[in-house]
From Swiss-Prot:
Family named by the database record: Belongs to the actin family.
Gene Ontology BP term (one): root hair elongation
CDD domains (UniProt xref): ASKHA_NBD_actin
Function statement: Actins are highly conserved proteins that are involved in various types of cell motility and are ubiquitously expressed in all eukaryotic cells. Essential component of cell cytoskeleton; plays an important role in cytoplasmic streaming, cell shape determination, cell division, organelle movement and extension growth. This is considered as one of the vegetative actins.
Species name: Arabidopsis thaliana (Mouse-ear cress)
Organism taxonomic ancestry: Eukaryota, Viridiplantae, Streptophyta, Embryophyta, Tracheophyta
Modified residues (N-acetylalanine): 2
Gene of this entry: ACT2
Listed name of the protein: Actin-2
């Protein structure tokens, strides 16, 4: 890849909820849009209107009233490759406005993903988009890079899936990675449910987006859940108003902290899983006894679902209760954690030492999609 020096690599973080894309070396993604493909529910009757058979991202969101919205990524795994291809096409041509055959591309994926997933990604990049080179990196590892560390445990929680990934000197420890299929989308669904108990009805895919906005603007994590519940019964200090698109104003109280509490008590949504604090602890306990101290001192939060205020204090409190009493515990919540996977990718792809890591088109032509397991780890 002699000619790679003058061409900026593309970094594309394909999340379950949002695609973050941009150029390596930038400090933030240029394009952030929903990972959604919408298809018309009705046939077009207006002659001369150029109706498309599919809309991607923000355009799909704005026309959501007449479309069926589908997310091609579920729980971090691509479930619909045709739609995924549309999203990538949209990213390259409409959002970044580049020719994919001219730029190396760094993609991200969730840990513990099926092997076929990254093979298919590789195949599409080289065969459909003619990329000159590509690489697939693990999301949580990139978040750690972005925080300036090489050792630590990352709790990465997005829209579709949460993970705890212990990393030592830059290597993730696969035997200790734990995955929790509980994330932002489940919190939105739970908030829809508990708002219904208050008498507000939210049912359609379009209304779900409104509830997601309520969640993002008003929710917080209680440091002491029981105590907050008691307070909210007697006082209205916690209540906030939210104006719906049609002008109606709704009031939301204890729901503000009941919603993210699911992360710590998954039984609220009928899941028999451990909460994020316990999953983090279990993940640390699966690691070698000598490195646990370094992990306890570097617990890094990443992803949009860790954006709730109060989450770092609560994490710290819960893990302190589980860990040995003399252990020093530090939970780091970087302010840019919503995009830290992308930022880590931007850092990685612009390192001079990384340039020999790319899988080139020539290597792919020789070895096939399986090469991705040999070169990306």
């Amino acid at each position: 890849m002699a000619e790679a020096d003058d061409i900026q690599p593309i970094v594309c973080d394909n999340g379950t909820g949002m695609v973050k894309a941009g150029f390596a070396g930038d400090d933030a993604p240029r394009a952030v849009f929903p990972s959604v493909v919408g298809r018309p529910r009705h046939h077009g009757v207006m002659v001369g209107m150029n109706q498309k058979d599919a809309y991607v991202g923000d355009e799909a969101q704005s026309k959501r009233g007449i479309l069926t919205l589908k997310y091609p990524i579920e729980h971090g795994v691509v479930s619909n490759w045709d739609d995924m291809e549309k999203i990538w096409h949209h990213t390259f041509y409409n959002e970044l406005r580049i020719a994919p055959e001219e730029h190396p591309v760094l993609l991200t994926e969730a840990p513990l993903n099926p092997k076929a997933n990254r093979e298919k990604m590789t195949q599409i990049m080289f065969e459909t988009f003619n990329s000159p080179a590509m690489y697939v990196a693990i999301q949580a590892v990139l978040s750690l890079y972005a925080s300036g560390r090489t050792t630590g445990i990352v709790l990465d929680s997005g829209d579709g899936v949460s993970h705890t990934v212990p990393i030592y000197e830059g290597f993730s420890l696969p035997h200790a990675i734990l995955r929790l299929d509980l994330a932002g989308r489940d919190l939105t669904d739970y908030l829809m449910k508990i708002l219904t108990e208050r008498g507000y009805m939210f049912t359609t895919t379009a209304e779900r987006e409104i509830v997601r906005d309520i969640k993002e603007k008003l929710s917080f994590v209680a440091v002491d859940y029981e105590q907050e519940m008691e307070t909210s019964k007697t006082s209205s200090s916690i209540e906030k108003n939210y104006e719906l698109p049609d002008g109606q104003v709704i009031t939301i109280g204890a729901e503000r902290f009941r919603c993210p509490e699911v992360l710590f008590q998954p039984s609220f949504v009928g899941m028999e899983a451990a909460g994020i604090h316990e999953t983090t602890y279990n993940s640390i306990m699966k690691c070698d006894v000598d490195i646990r101290k370094d992990l306890y001192g570097n617990i890094v939060l990443s992803g949009g679902t860790t954006m709730f205020s109060g989450i770092a204090d609560r994490m710290s409190k819960e893990i302190t209760a589980l860990a040995p009493s003399s252990m020093k515990i530090k939970v780091v919540a970087p302010p840019e954690r919503k995009y830290s996977v992308w930022i880590g990718g931007s850092i990685l792809a612009s390192l001079s030492t990384f340039q020999q890591m790319w899988i080139s088109k020539a290597e792919y032509d020789e070895a096939g999609p399986g090469i991705v397991h040999r070169k990306c780890f």
